[in-house]
Amino acid sequence: MATIGLDKLFYSKITEGENGDETYAAPVALAKAMTAELSVELAEATLYADDGAAEVVKEFQSGTLTLGVDDIGKSVAEDLTGAVIDENGVLISASEDGGAPVAIGFRAKKANGKYRYFWLYRVIFGIPATNLTTKGESIEFSTPSIEGTVTRRNKVDGQGKHPWKAEVSEDDSGVSPAVITGWYDEVYEPSYADQTSDTGGEG
């Protein structure tokens, strides 16, 4: 189903343990979202047998998330891009800066008025792009965009896999209302009836 609106853009800072497993901080608002574009790159392998393709495996490799937002505040830019705020309150970006991984959550309104909710478990952003426009006869709003690389998380879920995205529609059958109402309280942690491993920690 097509989506027609985007809002409630949040991010969660990541702390990594010695083994690389992520612990997610409480989500905070990033900015007012206007657009989100997610492209995915798959790794593909083909097993040939009897002069034909016997099995084709396609696995998530990485993705690119491009967000169009109304404004990126200094503290958010510091968290997402590695820039620093100096003693005069000026945001300083250096060539040595590198963004720390974060989780990104948002929701998109569907054509039927219901929402689809998302968490991307590990995203590393670059420096935001800024568009400046001279004032002409008409008013033109110039808004920043920020691009990040999406990867799978290091921490395995209850089935021993490395998730990169969680999504749910509030009108999907079998979805608990508590999942929707608590979507931004913490980064969603997959839950399975047949848990095969102890993921441990906060998630």
Describe every region a protein language model picked out.
Residues E55-Y121, G126-P128:
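Structured, beta-strand-rich domain cores
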Residues P128-G203:
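Mixed-charge, glycine-accented linear interaction segment located at domain edges/termini
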Residues M1-A77, F125-T143:
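Solvent-exposed edge beta-strands and adjacent loop segments
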Residues M1-E22, P101-Y115, T196-G201:
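Short, structured interface segments that constitute the first stable element of a domain
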Residues S39, D79-G82, Y117-W119, N131-K135, ...:
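Surface-exposed beta-strand edges and their flanking turn/coil or helix-capping segments
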Residues M34, I104-F106, E167:
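Intrinsic disorder/low-complexity segments
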Residues T23-A29, Y117-V123, G160-S169:
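Short amphipathic beta-strand/extended segments with alternating polar/hydrophobic composition
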